[in-house]
């Protein structure tokens, strides 16, 4: 019987090896992808539990299946912890991803074809904020706002002007590659001025909001969406928050049965664990350290005239760098750094001139290295090594030196003890 196959390694050597190789890769790499992090063993244990066996369409106490008493407890814990952590009245923990959380919010607030104002992808927005290749751009009429060409920061007066000209039904605030504080109060004022809903996608900064190191959107947004990984350091999944009961009911209907069937209760359990971790006082220190590390790294790039630091700095967990003075494009920079076991992603920069498959920039984030215990000193050194590798990308001797020093760093800060 299949139930006898309890030795994973013996039963499926190929798959076991692939997972083992990935564990080794993560251990030996400096992870600087801003949307990635390192979850606790408790989060992994919850996600790998028997809850994966249980189907539970509906919501706690209102299920379409029997035998749901235990999963009701699990999901209720996740809901209450999310509400407490973010000081919100209502929470839906069922979205399978941030994109599905955004889709549910759109479904709850607007109709297909309605005008929506969202951040331009090259300026730091997300695919689901109106990109033509996304369901969002195909289903709704998105108009984009960008950043100021000089400061490379949000220009709220210009956003108001665009809103007045286009009269959107919904304004989306939030980003996937914007390094500065977002003023949600100003966004709400703009939304109110044109009688629009305000939705905030805080997927990237949720952990910083939770730890008190970025202003919360909850008092201002009609709906707030997020992922539960990234800076929140939980499993991959989505979460929707609101203080409006009528909107909460629409959100619930949009998630189920609107977009999804049965929730992934094993993932919801892992979300509950991560939310409890974020409620611990130590998480405030973690959020502070993420920002300190990002600012330390950004400063190294800022002090080198061969690189352009977008917006001249960072207030959060990430920053963007134009690398085209030292290497052809961001894609090549990504590949060179991967050679020396530093993982990040190519990224478009404001007013990008290259294709999204090449880009002028790279995006650098510090959640994962901070989770491993690295601090300001290590962050500065990593930035120095990145610059060394990029400036000497055709010199294999130099790349070997960098790779060896990266190995020393990763050995000193293991992914998981034992």
UniProtKB/Swiss-Prot annotation:
InterPro entries: PyrdxlP-dep_Trfase, PyrdxlP-dep_Trfase_major, PyrdxlP-dep_Trfase_small, Ser_HO-MeTrfase, Ser_HO-MeTrfase-like, Ser_HO-MeTrfase_PLP_BS, SHMT-like_dom. It is found in: Cytoplasm. Its EC number is 2.1.2.1. Pathway: One-carbon metabolism; tetrahydrofolate interconversion; Amino-acid biosynthesis; glycine biosynthesis; glycine from L-serine: step 1/1. The modification N6-(pyridoxal phosphate)lysine is found at residue 230. Signal peptide: none annotated. The record marks 229 as: Plays an important role in substrate specificity. Keywords: Amino-acid biosynthesis, Cytoplasm, One-carbon metabolism, Pyridoxal phosphate, Transferase. GO terms for cellular component: cytosol. HAMAP family: SHMT. NCBIfam families: PRK00011.1. This is Serine hydroxymethyltransferase. It comes from Streptococcus agalactiae serotype V (strain ATCC BAA-611 / 2603 V/R).
């Amino acid at each position: 019987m299949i139930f006898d196959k309890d030795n994973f390694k013996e039963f499926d050597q190929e798959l076991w090896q692939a997972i083992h190789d990935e564990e080794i890769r993560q251990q030996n790499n400096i992870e600087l992808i801003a949307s990635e992090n390192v979850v606790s063993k408790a989060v992994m244990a919850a996600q790998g539990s028997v809850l994966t066996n249980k189907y539970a369409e509906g919501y706690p106490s209102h299920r379409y299946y029997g035998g749901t008493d235990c999963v009701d407890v699990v999901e209720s814990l996740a809901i209450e912890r999310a509400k407490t952590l973010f000081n919100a009245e209502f929470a839906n923990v069922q979205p399978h991803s941030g994109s599905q959380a955004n889709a549910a919010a759109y479904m709850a607030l607007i109709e297909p074809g309605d005008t929506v104002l969202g951040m331009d992808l090259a300026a730091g927005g997300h695919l689901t904020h109106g990109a033509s290749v996304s369901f969002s751009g195909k289903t709704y009429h998105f108009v984009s706002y960008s950043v100021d060409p000089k400061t490379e920061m949000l220009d709220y007066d210009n956003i108001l002007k665009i809103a007045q000209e286009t009269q959107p039904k919904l304004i989306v605030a939030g980003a996937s590659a914007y390094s500065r504080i977002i003023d949600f109060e100003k966004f709400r004022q703009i939304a109110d001025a044109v009688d629009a809903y305000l939705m905030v996608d805080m997927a990237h900064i949720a952990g910083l909001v939770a730890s008190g190191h970025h202003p919360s959107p909850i008092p201002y947004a009609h709906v707030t969406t997020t992922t539960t990984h990234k800076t929140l350091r939980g499993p991959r999944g989505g979460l929707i928050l609101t203080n409006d009961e009528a909107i909460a009911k629409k959100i619930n209907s949009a998630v189920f049965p609107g977009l999804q069937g049965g929730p992934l209760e094993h993932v919801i359990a892992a979300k509950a664990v991560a939310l409890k971790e974020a409620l611990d006082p130590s998480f405030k220190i973690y959020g502070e350290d993420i920002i300190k590390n990002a600012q330390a790294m950004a400063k190294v790039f800022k002090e080198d005239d061969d690189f352009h630091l977008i917006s001249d700095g960072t207030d959060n967990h990430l920053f963007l760098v134009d690398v085209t003075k030292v290497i052809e494009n961001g894609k090549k920079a990504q590949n060179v750094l991967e050679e020396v076991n530093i993982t990040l992603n190519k990224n478009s920069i404001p007013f990008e001139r290259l294709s999204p498959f090449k880009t002028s920039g790279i995006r650098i984030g510090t959640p994962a290295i901070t989770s491993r215990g690295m601090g300001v000193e290590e962050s500065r050194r990593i930035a120095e090594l990145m610059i060394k590798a990029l400036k000497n990308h055709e010199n294999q001797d130099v790349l070997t030196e960098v790779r060896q020093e990266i190995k020393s760093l990763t050995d000193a800060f293991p992914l998981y003890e034992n």
